[in-house]
């Protein structure tokens, strides 16, 4: 495929070719993707300098997946190369700070996923894991460093149990990630320390009221763990609430049934 767009502030035309290929071998599929993607810098950067160029990402993916009799597994390697990121630079003469499009970075890792709907009656479980290494030279970071939002290890397990007579599904989800990086002024380097690991145990119940009405309720972090999302002045940044509640009603107005209760 091919995409092009024109950005008026920078007066630049962006060309984004993309190629995807799949090879099927029985119940297995091999896939490869290479593509160029662009996006505008964030609004707060464009306000300071509207002439900033669109940020660029060259993405490469190689994956394999296997699907057989209710069991599905997938593994994917990826590499992303970033260019023209917004970067704060200082004029050598005036010492004025200004934004340029000279930032760059990369991200690489592996995604693993497994789902089993066949081993146990009325029960489905999922396992997922992501390993990621990300580096950026952008914004106020004048050397390659790990962004504040990037965590190296992310994992989750999900168990769903169906209650056909009650037309309901009960789910339990446990999410884990290694600590987010933050800058500790007592240590050398940038983004040189991590907060404690993240963990959240969530519960959910889905009720099929009719073929076109689904009611879903969930609550997160039932153990009320104090998860940290960074540090400012050596004080932990916490969520506004230890856990959240959600209740949603999904109604299909068309003739066809569009919602699949097993997706909740």
Predicted regions and their residues:
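Signature of Gram-negative outer-membrane beta-barrel scaffolds
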Residues: 1-25, 40-41
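Transmembrane beta-barrel strands of outer-membrane/channel proteins
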Residues: 2-4, 21, 32-36, 64, ...
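Residues that define the transmembrane beta-barrel architecture of outer-membrane proteins
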Residues: 13-15, 56-60, 67-69, 104-110, ...
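Residues on the lipid-exposed face of transmembrane beta-strands in outer-membrane beta-barrel proteins
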Residues: 19-23, 62-66, 110-116, 127, ...
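Membrane-embedded beta-barrel scaffold of Gram-negative outer-membrane proteins
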Residues: 24-33, 54-115, 121-123
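Repeated loop/turn-to-beta-strand initiation elements of outer-membrane beta-barrel proteins
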Residues: 27-31, 70-74, 120-125, 165-170, ...
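Gram-negative outer-membrane beta-barrel transporters
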Residues: 79-81, 100-183, 223
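C-terminal beta-signal and adjacent terminal beta-strands/loops
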Residues: 119, 176-183, 205-264
């Amino acid at each position: 495929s091919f995409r092009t767009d024109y950005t008026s502030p920078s007066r630049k035309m962006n060309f984004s070719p993309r190629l995807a290929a799949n090879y099927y071998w029985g119940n297995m599929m091999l896939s490869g993707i290479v593509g160029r993607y662009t996006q505008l810098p964030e609004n707060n950067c464009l306000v300071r300098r509207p002439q900033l160029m669109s940020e660029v990402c060259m993405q490469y993916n190689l994956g394999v997946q296997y699907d057989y009799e209710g069991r599905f597994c997938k593994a994917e390697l990826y590499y992303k190369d970033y260019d023209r990121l917004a970067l704060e630079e200082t004029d050598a003469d005036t010492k004025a700070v200004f934004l340029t499009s000279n930032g760059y970075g990369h991200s690489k890792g592996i995604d693993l996923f497994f789902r089993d709907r066949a081993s146990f009656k009325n029960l489905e479980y999922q396992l997922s894991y992501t390993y990621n290494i990300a580096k950026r030279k952008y914004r106020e970071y004048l050397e390659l460093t790990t962004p504040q939002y990037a965590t190296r290890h992310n994992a989750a397990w999900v168990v769903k149990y169906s209650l056909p007579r009650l037309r309901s599904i009960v789910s339990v989800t446990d999410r884990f990630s290694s600590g987010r990086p933050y800058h500790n002024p007592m240590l050398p380097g940038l983004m040189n320390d991590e907060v404690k690991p993240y963990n959240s145990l969530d519960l959910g119940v889905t009720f099929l009221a009719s073929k076109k009405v689904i009611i879903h309720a969930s609550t997160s972090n039932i153990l009320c763990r104090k998860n940290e999302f960074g540090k400012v002045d050596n004080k932990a940044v916490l969520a506004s609430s230890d856990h959240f509640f959600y209740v949603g009603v999904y109604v299909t107005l068309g003739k066809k049934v569009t919602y699949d209760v097993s997706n909740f």
